A protein has these predicted regions:
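FAD-dinucleotide binding site
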Residues: 3, 10-25, 35-502
Length: 502
C-alpha cells in the first residue's frame, strides 16, 4: 500500500510564522537618521501638523517595507519606524559567530512555496535567487513515536496502509468542512458563528483517528497553526484551507533565499534609504481629523495615514489618544501570536543523512518535546561536511521552551536529538543558536493564531482598520502565517491608500 502524499502539505510546518507564516527575525542593524523625515515638535491637534502627503509605517518587516516601497512608487512621502536596531521583523538569518564553515540558519520565517508569487516577485526585483530544498524531504525523513523509529513513508504505510488512509481522512473531512466559504469574508459565512465557537481539536476528536494518524495530524496542525489544536478557531482553519493553493508535494516548503532570507528586507530597506528609522519604538499615537501624530524614539512624526505593520502584541503597550474603538481595542488585546521557538545545533557530520532506518533528509517528526526538526543545510553546503539540525517548537513545547534559559533550551534539544538519532550521541555541538519568539519584546510569538470565538469578531476589524489607521502583516491576510502573507498585506494596504492628494 502506498503511503499518503506529503503528510505535511498545506501549511506544512510553516515558519516556516510563518510562520511564519509567516514570518521570523532579520539580522540587519543600523543607526537612526540624524534628521528623520517627518519629524516635528509635538502638536496639540494632529490635524494641524499632519503632513497631507505622508504615510507613517510602523514596522520594518516584510509587510511594512513592502507597503513603504509601493507607497513611495505611488508618490507618497513615507517614514518607516522600527523598534529594533535592525530591519526584517520576523525574518532573521543567524550566521557569523554563531556557526562555522559559512553555515547559516533561519531563526524565523524560513521556507517558500512555489505559489508564493508575491514574495518571489520581490526577490526577483532585488536580484535575489533561491536555493531548492529536497523534494521528498518529509517522506524521506524520520518519524520517532513511542520508541519506534521509521522513515515517515514507512510509518504512514503502517497497519497495511490504514495509517495513511486515516491520515488522509482528516484532510478529506477538511475538504467538506466549509467548501463554499469565501476566505476574504469568513465572518459572513452562513455557519461562521458555529465554526468559530468550535476548536480544531473538537473537529479532530470527532474523527476518532488511529493513534498513529492522530500523531501525524497533530504534528501537522501544531506546526501549521503554531498552537495546540484546542487553541485554534475552526473557522480560521476553514478559511486557511479554502485559500490554500493546490500545490504538488514537491512545491511545498520548496526553497529558501540563497545566502539567507534576511537579504530581502535588507535590500528593501537599502532602496528606501533614510526614511527607515531604527531604534524607534512607538509609545504614543494621536489620531484625529485628517491625520495622525506618532511618538517614537523620543521624536514625533506627523502624517496623513498610519500603517501599523506589526503584530498586535507590541501594540498593547502603545497609548492611543483618543482610545481606539472598543472592537479595535478588543482585537488588539485578544489576537495572540502562537508561541514558537527554534534551536539550531551544528554537528561535525550530518549523521541524520545516513540513518539505519533509511531516513536521509533530517526532517524529523517526534513525540519528544521538540516535536519537529529539519536540516537547515538541506539546500546548500557540502553533504559530507558539517551540518545544522533545527528544532521548531510550537504549542505546549514552545511554551515550555520560553520558560527556559537559552542554555537550558539548547541542552534539552541536544539530548532529544541524540535520542531521535543515536548516531549523534557524543558529537560535540559547540556552535548553537536559539530564539524563543514569545520572549521577543517587539514580537511576542511566532505567527497569529485566532482562538475560538475570535475570527467572526476580529476579521472585519483587522481588514478595515479605523479612521486614519490601517493594519498590515501576516495576521491581516486571507493566507496567514507566511512571509508571502506579509508581502501581500503590504501590497494590499498601499493599493487601498492609492495616490496622495494633489
Amino acid at each position: 500500500v502506498s503511503p499518503p502524499a506529503d503528510p505535511h502539505r498545506r501549511r506544512a510546518l510553516a515558519v516556516g510564522l510563518g510562520a511564519a507564516a509567516a514570518a521570523g527575525l532579520s539580522a540587519c542593524s543600523g543607526s537612526s537618521s540624524p534628521e528623520p523625515p517627518g519629524t516635528s515638535a509635538t502638536t496639540d491637534d494632529p490635524s494641524e501638523g499632519a503632513a497631507v502627503g505622508r504615510v507613517i509605517v510602523v514596522g520594518a518587516g516584510l509587510a511594512g517595507l513592502t507597503a513603504a516601497l509601493d507607497l513611495v512608487d505611488a508618490g507618497w512621502e513615507v517614514v518607516v519606524l522600527e523598534a529594533r536596531t535592525r530591519v526584517g521583523g520576523r525574518v532573521h538569518t543567524i550566521r557569523g559567530e554563531a556557526f562555522t564553515e559559512g553555515l547559516r540558519a533561519e531563526a524565523g520565517g524560513e521556507s517558500i512555496d512555489v505559489d508564493h508569487t508575491d514574495l518571489l516577485a520581490m526577490l526577483d526585483r532585488f536580484g535575489l535567487e533561491t536555493e531548492d530544498r529536497p523534494a521528498n524531504k518529509i517522506l524521506d525523513g524520520l518519524t520517532s513515536w513511542r520508541g519506534r523509529r521509521q522513515t515517515t513513508a514507512e510509518f504512514a504505510a503502517g497497519r497495511e496502509g490504514d495509517v495513511g488512509a486515516d491520515y488522509e481522512r482528516f484532510y478529506a473531512a477538511l475538504d467538506e468542512l466549509a467548501p463554499d466559504i469565501d476566505p476574504a469574508h469568513p465572518d459572513e459565512y452562513e455557519r461562521a458563528d458555529e465554526l468559530d465557537q468550535r476548536s480544531l481539536a473538537d473537529f479532530v476528536d470527532e474523527l476518532d483517528l488511529l493513534p498513529e494518524a492522530r500523531f501525524l495530524v497533530d504534528a501537522d496542525n501544531r506546526g501549521g497553526f503554531n498552537a495546540e489544536a484546542e487553541d485554534v478557531s475552526l473557522l480560521f482553519v476553514a478559511q486557511q484551507w479554502a485559500v490554500g493553493e493546490d500545490v504538488a508535494d514537491e512545491g511545498v516548503e520548496a526553497m529558501r533565499v540563497a545566502g539567507g532570507n534576511d537579504q530581502l528586507p535588507q535590500a528593501m530597506a537599502a532602496e528606501l534609504g533614510d526614511v527607515v528609522v531604527l531604534d524607534a519604538p512607538v509609545t504614543r499615537v494621536r489620531h484625529r481629523g485628517d491625520g495622525v501624530t506618532v511618538t517614537a524614539g523620543g521624536a514625533t512624526y506627523d502624517g496623513a495615514w498610519l500603517v501599523l505593520a506589526c503584530p498586535f502584541t507590541p501594540l498593547r503597550a502603545v497609548a492611543f489618544d483618543p482610545p481606539l474603538p472598543d472592537d479595535v481595542a478588543t482585537a488588539i488585546e485578544g489576537l495572540d501570536l502562537g508561541p514558537a521557538a527554534k534551536v539550531t545545533l551544528q554537528y561535525a557530520e550530518r549523521g541524520w543523512a545516513d540513518d539505519p532506518t533509511g531516513a536521509t533528509s533530517g526532517f524529523t517528526v517526534s513525540d519528544q518535546p521538540f516535536g519537529i526538526a529539519w536540516s537547515s543545510t538541506d539546500s546548500y553546503g557540502d553533504p559530507d561536511g558539517p551540518g545544522l539540525l533545527t528544532a521548531f517548537l510550537t504549542g505546549d513545547g514552545a511554551e515550555a521552551a520560553a520558560a527556559q534559559t537559552d542554555a537550558q533550551r539548547i541542552e534539552a534539544v541536544e539530548r532529544q536529538f541524540a535520542e531521535a538519532y543515536p548516531q549523534l550521541e557524543g558529537q560535540e555541538t559547540r556552535h548553537r543558536a536559539t530564539v524563543a519568539w514569545a520572549k521577543e519584546r517587539y514580537t511576542g510569538g511566532g505567527y497569529a493564531v485566532p482562538h475560538p470565538g475570535q475570527v467572526a469578531a476580529f476579521w472585519p476589524v483587522i481588514r478595515a482598520g479605523t479612521g486614519r489607521i490601517r493594519f498590515a502583516g501576516e495576521h491581516t491576510e486571507e493566507l496567514a502565517g507566511y512571509m508571502e502573507s506579509a508581502v501581500r498585506s503590504g501590497h494590499r494596504i498601499a493599493a487601498e491608500l492609492g495616490t496622495p492628494p494633489s
